[in-house]
Amino acid sequence: VALQEKKTMDMDISNIAHDIRTPLTVASGYAQQSLRSSREDDMAMEKISKNLLTVSKRLEALLEYRRLTEGAIQPQFQDLDFSQLVVKSILPYYDMFQEKGITLDIQVTPDIQCEMDPDIFERLFQNIISNVLKHGKTQAQLTLQKKDDGIYLSVSNMVQQPIQHLDQLTTRFYSENLSDTEDSSGLGLYITEHLVQVLEGELHLAYENE
């Protein structure tokens, strides 16, 4: 069983290494083109920057994936004001939502206390918001409320493309072409779900046709 798991992991790493190699090759090509040019090629430099950013994101996802599979992520719970943490976490993304033309409605019930690892929460929250910015359009909503059976953090958004297989979105390396401009490594929601589980929570996905 252990050998089979190792083979599966090696195959997964090979797949994402291929995904990393492609944008890196593109970036390298444009870099060489710019060096040969007698003047600064702004468009080429922009493409270099975009592809190197893609490489950086996929390497980060791969490292996070390895830490999860090796059981290296252990939560350090502390009592805190979860409402404040959520507001603090969303504020840095405000300008990005404006740039994307997405109106974000924030409804956070104040003074919700809980035990939480803020660092792990920041990582999974970044994955969720990045997903909204990448695949969303027009409108999005973030709500935090406390009910009798637990604390509920909900993020909803309109999507650029219809979702075909909702039940597979958290599957390792599965991705759908939900963005008009960006592709995906297929690790974002897989990592997010497992980080939520590390925090002893549950992740639920839902989709409604417009």
Residue ranges of each PLM-predicted region?
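Conserved micro-motifs of the catalytic ATP-binding
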Residues: 71-75, 113-116
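Conserved catalytic submotifs in the C-terminal HATPase_c
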Residues: 78, 103-112
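Short helix-loop "hinge" at the ATP-lid/N-box region of the Bergerat-fold HATPase_c
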Residues: 131-133
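Short beta-strand/loop element within the Bergerat-fold HATPase_c
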Residues: 139-149
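A residue-level detector for a conserved hydrophobic packing site
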Residues: 121-125
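Short conserved segment of the HATPase_c
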Residues: 161-174
